[in-house]
Amino acid sequence: TRIMKITSVAVLGAGAVGSYVIWGLANREDIKLGVIAEGERKERLSRQGCAINGKVYHPEVWTPEEAENVDFLIVSLKYGALPGALESIRKIVGKDTSVMSLMNGVDSEEIIAEQIGKSHILPAVIKVASHREADGYHFDPETTLGIIFGEYEAPYESERVKAVKELFAGTGIHYRSTEYAIEEVWCKFRLNVCNNLPQAILGAGVGCYRDSEHM
């Protein structure tokens, strides 16, 4: 197999999760980094950039057509936005594109796979407490657990997994590969349902599990 090296990365969804990826990869001068946007949003992102942790980053801004056959596509949309983005994903993904979905919910990988085929997808989950303030997105790089990813089946230490590790290495992004990527996705889903739902009902903040004797 040819040695894989990721030289171009597209981020679809430049919100809380996408910001973590942009923040990390913006420092890599050996890759092309772009955010996917069209029309008025493309103009705005090109003009204003992405404000993250008090600094403004200016990744390139690509239409789905301009991003066609990118090496690595990271989908970090809000769950409800996925159906409307499937056509964009189809346009972006070429025969050598790998796709990582960093979305909540357990079926985003399946929904994307229906469009482009499962072989393009590297299952993953992200754990980052990122929130929006007036001056953009904020998170603590030190305490962020980061991105957990791995192949659906052996060989787990695939060319693609090695290429993604190499991409993230030294960027500040926290990451690890695992043989249990699918279980990790379910585990996060369970956490969201079992922790965040009661929290939402009670109107309590994320820290309440550590602080309150009632939770």
Model regions and ranges:
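A structural signal for isolated positions on well-ordered beta-strands in alpha/beta enzyme cores
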Residues: 10, 32-34, 100, 122, ...
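Rossmann-like NAD(P)(H) cofactor-binding subdomain of soluble oxidoreductases
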Residues: 54-138
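Short, charged/polar "capping" segments at the starts of alpha-helices
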Residues: 41-46, 109-110, 157
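NAD(P)+-binding Rossmann beta1-loop-alpha1 motif at the extreme N-terminus of oxidoreductases
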Residues: 4-58
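Flexible, glycine-rich phosphate/dinucleotide-binding loops
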Residues: 18, 42, 108, 130, ...
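Internal alpha-helical scaffold of NAD(P)-dependent oxidoreductase catalytic cores
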Residues: 62, 91-92, 115-120, 135-215
